[in-house]
Amino acid sequence: QAPWPDTISPP
């Protein structure tokens, strides 16, 4: 699981 939602891109 990524530390951000799958609906947004990482910084």
UniProtKB/Swiss-Prot annotation:
The keyword Secreted applies. Keywords: Hypotensive agent, Metalloenzyme inhibitor, Metalloprotease inhibitor, Protease inhibitor, Pyrrolidone carboxylic acid, Secreted. One of its GO terms (cellular component) is extracellular region. GO terms for biological process: regulation of blood pressure. It is found in: Secreted. Expressed by the venom gland. Its main location: secreted. Disulfide bonds: none annotated. The keyword Amino-acid biosynthesis does not apply. Coiled coil: none annotated. GO terms for molecular function: peptidase inhibitor activity. The modification Pyrrolidone carboxylic acid is found at Q1. This peptide potentiates the effects of bradykinin on smooth muscle, and inhibits the angiotensin-converting enzyme (ACE) in vitro. Belongs to the bradykinin-potentiating peptide family. This is Bradykinin-potentiating peptide S. The lineage of its organism: Eukaryota, Metazoa, Ecdysozoa, Arthropoda, Chelicerata.
